[in-house]
A protein has these predicted regions:
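HTH-adjacent hinge/linker in prokaryotic transcriptional regulators
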Residues: 2-7, 16-22, 28-30, 35-100, ...
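Short, active-site-adjacent cap segments at secondary-structure transitions
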Residues: 58, 103-106, 132-133, 183-184
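Generic beta-structure capping elements
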Residues: 60-62, 101, 147, 179-180
């Protein structure tokens, strides 16, 4: 039986494949009562993740538009664990770039705790995410740079040609990116054209590239590819990929870090 925090993510993966799921189907898949499923359906509709209709949960047509709030509720515990592990890769003296996704945001929260505890003497952080900036409390050791550009209120981030022009002179020891899908054929991909382009730009200025993604993204592809497998240094996730993808990652010399849960 899936844990409570995993059920929403599981149903979202079903909707992504089939477009709909009934109460009875979800009850059998999740191993919970029909009443529990109906409550879950209601919560998902209230969050804008899906639409209820006559005992069936359907994909929300507007759900193709990314929402930071809605995405934060899917695989939330897994994202927290991934974020905590990823934050441990940051070292004193680093110049890092933080992407705008919800999993990287969890990393930002964990990194903020490390900064507050006095672990760093010098740290430079560049990000296109407004929520990342808000999560990082001012500290004398930390220089924080928010890049400008076209603001997306749903994503709470900046992107576009001006953002890429701003990024161009920088050099990063490490960049930490999210993704909406990763598979052998398409590599790492995003559902947003501007973010995909920005990620490619950032990677070109980075010594090491870390991708943070929960297990629902493994084996899938999104709209725009931004990197082949061999362009990534480390992937941090919560579960083992399927054998074919794991083999492809190993062949591409991508280091796989599992946070377990």
């Amino acid at each position: 039986m899936l844990r409570k925090n995993e059920r929403t993510g599981y149903l979202m993966s079903i909707l992504k494949r089939t477009g709909h799921v009934t109460v009875s189907e979800a009850s059998e898949m999740l191993g919970v009562s029909g009443a529990t499923v109906r409550r879950l359906f209601a919560q998902m509709e209230e969050s804008g993740l899906a639409i209820r209709s006559h005992g069936t949960l359907r994909s929300n047509p507007s759900g193709s538009v990314y929402s930071f709030e809605a995405s934060s509720q899917v695989y939330s515990k897994e994202k927290q664990n991934i974020g905590r592990m990823a934050a441990m890769f940051v070292e004193d003296g680093d110049i890092i770039y933080l992407d705008c996704g919800t999993t990287v945001f969890q990393m930002t929260l964990a990194l903020s705790q490390r900064i507050a505890s006095g672990e760093f003497q010098s740290l430079n952080i560049v990000t296109n995410s407004l929520v990342n900036v808000q999560a990082l409390n001012p500290d004398p050791c930390c220089q924080l740079i928010l890049v400008g550009g076209i603001y997306n209120s749903e994503r709470r981030d900046f992107s576009g040609p001006l953002t890429e022009k701003f990024i161009a002179p920088f050099h990063f020891n490490k960049c930490f990116l999210g993704c909406d899908g990763v598979n052998q054929r398409d590599g790492f991909s995003s559902k947003d054209v501007n973010i995909s382009s920005l990620n490619s730009c950032v990677m070109g200025r980075s010594d090491a590239v870390y991708v943070l993604c929960d297990s629902s993204k493994l084996g899938h592809s999104s709209m725009v590819s931004y990197a082949p497998l061999d362009r990534i240094t480390v992937i941090v996730t919560n579960a083992e990929p399927e054998a074919d993808l794991r083999s492809a990652l190993q062949s591409a010399n991508v280091h796989l870090n599992l946070c377990g849960g």
